[in-house]
Amino acid sequence: MAAAQEADGAGSAVVAAGGGSSGQVTSNGSIGRDTPAETQPQNPPPQPAPNAWQVIKGVLFRIFIIWAISSWFRRGPSPQDQSGPGGAPRVASRNLFPKDTLMNLHVYISEHEHFTDFNATSALFWEQHDLVYGDWTSGENSDGCYEHFAELDIPQSVQQNGSIYIHVYFTKSGFHPDPRQKALYRRLATVHMSRMINKYKRRRFQKTKNLLTGETEADPEMIKRAEDYGPVEVISHWHPNITINIVDDHTPWVKGSVPPPLDQYVKFDAVSGDYYPIIYFNDYWNLQKDYYPINESLASLPLRVSFCPLSLWRWQLYAAQSTKSPWNFLGDELYEQSDEEQDSVKVALLETSPYLLALTIIVSIVHSVFEFLAFKNDIQFWNSRQSLEGLSVRSVFFGVFQSFVVLLYILDNETNFVVQVSVFIGVLIDLWKITKVMDVRLDREHRVAGIFPCPTFKDKSTYIESSTKVYDDMAFRYLSWILFPLLGCYAVYSLLYLEHKGWYSWVLSMLYGFLLTFGFITMTPQLFINYKLKSVAHLPWRMLTYKALNTFIDDLFAFVIKMPVMYRIGCLRDDVVFFIYLYQRWIYRVDPTRVNEFGMSGEDVSAAASRAQASTAAGALTPAPSTAVSGEDASTVPKATSGACTASQPQEAPPKPAEDKKKD
């Protein structure tokens, strides 16, 4: 059971990057454009299902980040931050835009990061006058929000993977953002923020083909781009929605004391010391699946810009969510995968009932506890196991084979570093189990490549002398009648209908796909041994119980979060196997009155243990008699030697007196 779960768990960690959407409705109501046919990537090779538990762990990690930032924000400024240069105390600042200030909004679109061409009418995308700072009741929906939609005519540089920026200016009513208009421009009456609105994403191309015919279903244009740019191409992508939030905040911030990541949004004026209104570009609800690539076939791009006020606590949540993970030093691939995991979280938040979502978070905490307890009890069970009676040794070796195939598969598919490390640790644990089920020695007379000692494996005596070995061999012989034909059929199917990078990749993907589909069959030998022995007392029931509970929790996650059908079937089949274990535990229950080969029953052993414990307690409460011993008599008393074995050794008799010798 553990082996199949490890295969499913590792397989679910390898997730392919999501593609573009076709006619999809985004979370804020806009409809995404269809991706042009020539930009569609090739059909990726079948990838394992995403792991629901990894998604939930991401939610918990983000909740912790939000809590940490909120606690940091509520904390008072530290004393050392209260003094500025020269030891002068720092004074709490104020917002340069008081509440209910009349504002004008100017939105410009440009290819340049630094915008100066205010006279270009083509650059002005949206202009909204007489907005009220802190107004939550105006707008079409009486929520303080406004929006503007238009088609952007994009230049050739943007079509050829260039960047495009949005420049947002808020000015007090009666002023203009152009510094060259001296009469209408005021520095303290203008707040500006810009951002690149296209997003660069990696598109990976794996050159695959049918190994028998040499043909491929990949787009010829994609093959040509892969030859020109390599297997990984960075392509500009577009999403048609972006929201401009102005934070309704008048906190007396102190310069130098704003906690991260909030400090990157609070901008202070160098002269007055006050801070500008906080502008936040909110694209949190823009799902990755709604992005589509920008290429030369697109002459225009749709853009819907929304303006909404934002409360302080919601801004803190968004700022914490947009903060990059500290694990980004492991590679950009991990960051891209975290974006896809965030998409799963967002979909769950949008489509799941709040009560069910709260229950899922609570159960996920229980899942983490069970996961740790299952790991701890598994290690303790194998570490303290002295007899292999009733345990399938071959299943342990098959588990090592499964873990090794999974490791080679994720290395061949260039999965991120964290997944590789986790699978490698699992392989080491499985290899350690071999030393507990077999006698492993190093033969230094025979060396591998003349350098490394050759390991030798020998069955333990407790395994050879028991009937378990016979039943284990019999179970795997019956199992081979099923596995090998299925393996042959799957290999032929994979060779005829699937594309691969080469023969090595075909072997790995064929073995991995076979184990992922039929790996649960390897749990049946232990069921067969239990049936033959008519006993389940030899199984690590604590570990199995924790893993079964985790499987039931995975069932809940699989139906709360969108998962492939094969993943849900995998959870169901593990449940079925565990119910068979429970049925065997019920029919092969332990009989305390049964007499073993030594003529003892479980009741006799328990009664003897109780009597021994009672006599020990009584002896501890009864004081030993004390007698006075003279010096001469004391010399004749034998001295007790230390050690536990002296009580069982016979003592020599004292020498006989002379009168007794004469009588003899």
UniProtKB/Swiss-Prot annotation:
Pfam families for this protein: CLPTM1 (PF05602)
Chain ranges on the Cytoplasmic side, renumbered to this chain: 376-390, 438-477, 524-664
Glycosylation (residues): N28, N119, N161, N241, N295, N413
Regions that span the bilayer: 355-375, 391-411, 417-437, 478-498, 503-523
Annotated positions of the Phosphoserine modification: S601
Biological process (GO), any one: regulation of T cell differentiation in thymus
Signal peptide stretch: none
GO molecular function: GABA receptor binding
Annotated localization: Membrane
Compositional bias ranges of the Low complexity kind: 1-16, 618-628
Its membrane topology: Multi-pass membrane protein
Keywords, alphabetical: Acetylation, Developmental protein, Differentiation, Glycoprotein, Membrane, Phosphoprotein, Transmembrane, Transmembrane helix
Segments on the Extracellular face: 2-354, 412-416, 499-502
Tissue expression from the record: Widely expressed. Expressed by subcapsular and outer cortical thymic cells.
Gene Ontology, cellular component aspect: external side of plasma membrane
Region of interest called Disordered, as start-end residue ranges on this chain: 1-51, 618-664
Residue numbers carrying N-acetylalanine: A2
Protein family per UniProt: Belongs to the CLPTM1 family.
Function summary: Involved in GABAergic but not glutamatergic transmission. Binds and traps GABAA receptors in the endoplasmic reticulum (ER). Modulates postsynaptic GABAergic transmission, and therefore inhibitory neurotransmission, by reducing the plasma membrane expression of these receptors. Altered GABAergic signaling is one among many causes of cleft palate. Might function as a lipid scramblase, translocating lipids in membranes from one leaflet to the other one.
Additional free-text comment from the UniProt record: Mice overexpressing Clptm1 exhibit an aberrant development of thymocytes.
The protein's name in its UniProt record: Putative lipid scramblase CLPTM1
Gene: Clptm1
